[in-house]
Amino acid sequence: MGPTRTTPEPVRLTAAMRHDLTRAVGRALAPSAVLPRAEDVEELTVRLRGYAMCLVPEVEDRVGGMEQGATEWREATSALDDARRALGAGPGAGLRSAVGHMQELGRVCHRLRCHLPLGRVNGSES
């Protein structure tokens, strides 16, 4: 028996959403010598949170079809655990902690995305 679903049914990502997700993850994880503006951090955090909430149920669906205990299953369930932890956390007090939270959401989205088929768009393989 696979892990219990903790989220609503998946909202499948479109090709445009996948492209935007890739750009958002890149922005969140781009190295910078200075902290970004608070407004930019907030906007990107909201976007990444939304994507993580879409990705979690998709990965949960995939995990349900995996062999329990296999390497892929362990990596996917670890990514799900990290995503749930990040989604349950807040940005904290101050810009530095908000940037850290945004970056964590970027890493979470990247890890979750790695557990989906590359061509998956709206629930079908392309």
Question: What residue ranges belong to the model's regions?
Answer:
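Hydrophobic alpha-helical packing segments in soluble, helical-rich domains
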Residues: D40-E60
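Short, solvent-exposed, charged loop/turn and helix-capping segments
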Residues: C54-R74
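Gly-Asp-aromatic-enriched flexible segments
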Residues: A30, V34, R49, R62, ...
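Amphipathic, well-ordered alpha-helical segments in soluble domains
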Residues: L21-A24, Y51, L55, A79, ...
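Short, charged, amphipathic alpha-helical segments
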Residues: E42-V46, A70-T77, R96-Q103
